[in-house]
Amino acid sequence: MTISGAGAIPGGEITIDASKSSQFLSALLLIGPSMVNGITVTHQGGELPSMPHIDMTVAMLRDFGATVTVDRAAQKWSVAPGDLRGVDLVIEPDLSNAAPFLSLAMVCGGRVTIADWPRQTTQPGDQLREILTRMGATVEFTNDGLQLTGGASIHGIDIDLHDVGELTPSIAALAALADSPSHLRGIAHLRLHETDRLAALTREINGLGGNVSEEESDLQIDPTQGALHGGTFHTYEDHRLATAGAVIGLVVSDVLVENIATTRKTLPDFPGLWSSLLQ
């Protein structure tokens, strides 16, 4: 794709279908202040995925001085033209990246503490606290950060992950090791991520002896208890598939995660960090 800039973008009104990814909407909003006439974006299509990410975009724009108007009922977002102001920020850690590390304590027992977990945040990854509690963990804030203590077993879960789809691979890995079935719903948009994550998770977990059935927007995961066995867990160049395979490999012997280096996209030294927690 070749883009030839003309020095300024007029802006105005545009209608898009962002039902496959909220990033289309967020990207347009972020450049709204620099447009001559600002921008008004109307979503027309299926249900918007990952709404918390859109809310984060709006909050960040406002922090920098942008004027943003949101009409939820009309599915319309407007950003006025204008200069942004510089502000000092503390960049929060990406909470979704903590999912495999928190999962480790649930699978192996013991506890894991994640330092610098914000007590107040707009990140959808913060929902891990509630999700993993429902799956049997004890989660609490301490002076050192967020501490998760594994329970006696991992419980299955029936949950809509529409707004937190990036957590699905780790939740699916835990569900494959749970003591009861799980139903992960509202995640059709994951078919258009780095790979078709629903198809990939189904194929790879089943390839290790699991029992995952795939629907258009859901995964049904029925634990097979001791039937899981070793094998190659393919990643499809997808960092979250790689970490899901690593979680299963904690308790299933001889699991080889193919191309673990793909985790460099978000966790430059995932193998080193992972190994340090297993010693």
Set out the residue ranges of the language-model regions:
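Short, structured segments at the rim of ligand-binding sites
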Residues: 1-279
